[in-house]
Amino acid sequence: MAIAKEDILEAVSSMSVLELNELVKAFEEKFGVSAAAVAVAGPAGGGAAAAAEEQTEFTVNLTEVGANKVSVIKAVRELTGLGLKEAKDLVDGAPKPVKESVPKAAAEEAKKKLEEAGAKAEIK
């Protein structure tokens, strides 16, 4: 007696997640396969270099405070929304990241504001 596809689908749809997990493991053992997703082949040749060039998130690091510490603290507060004490601690602890995981335009704007305040900053 053959089992119809509809019967199998009905049985699977009524299973709990735990039962489905056990079913998948049984299929893996019985047929010697893996339920892992198939990896898609990337572009040949310079694919890794192109991926490295297209960085989308950047970190702005405060490297040096400079002579006008008060202006730098104000700039840090404006950029981060930190309170006065937190901004002062960040500036005193330089070199430290000021903004992390931001788009390139936002990183460049933050660097510009810090440099206008008299600090030295870098984008990574």
UniProtKB/Swiss-Prot annotation:
* GO cellular component terms listed in the entry, alphabetical order: cytosolic large ribosomal subunit
One Pfam family named in its UniProt record: Ribosomal_L12
Organism superkingdom: Bacteria
Q: Is the Cytoplasm keyword given for this protein?
A: no
* A GO molecular-function descriptor: mRNA binding
One of the GO BP terms on file: translation
Q: Which keywords fit this entry according to its UniProt record? A: Ribonucleoprotein, Ribosomal protein
Q: Does the keyword Ribosomal protein apply?
A: yes
User: Which InterPro entries did the record assign?
Assistant: Ribosomal_bL12 (IPR000206), Ribosomal_bL12_C (IPR013823), Ribosomal_bL12_C/ClpS-like (IPR014719), Ribosomal_bL12_oligo (IPR008932), Ribosomal_bL12_oligo_N_sf (IPR036235)
> Annotated region Disordered: where?
94-124
List the PANTHER family hit by this protein, alphabetically.
Answer: 39S RIBOSOMAL PROTEIN L12, LARGE RIBOSOMAL SUBUNIT PROTEIN BL12M
HAMAP family named in the record? Ribosomal_bL12 (MF_00368)
Q: How does it assemble?
A: Homodimer. Part of the ribosomal stalk of the 50S ribosomal subunit. Forms a multimeric L10(L12)X complex, where L10 forms an elongated spine to which 2 to 4 L12 dimers bind in a sequential fashion. Binds GTP-bound translation factors.
What role does it play?
Answer: Forms part of the ribosomal stalk which helps the ribosome interact with GTP-bound translation factors. Is thus essential for accurate translation.
- Provide the family line: Belongs to the bacterial ribosomal protein bL12 family.
Q: Which NCBIfam families match?
A: L12
**What protein is this chain from?**
Large ribosomal subunit protein bL12
The beginning of the lineage is: Bacteria, Pseudomonadati, Pseudomonadota, Betaproteobacteria, Burkholderiales
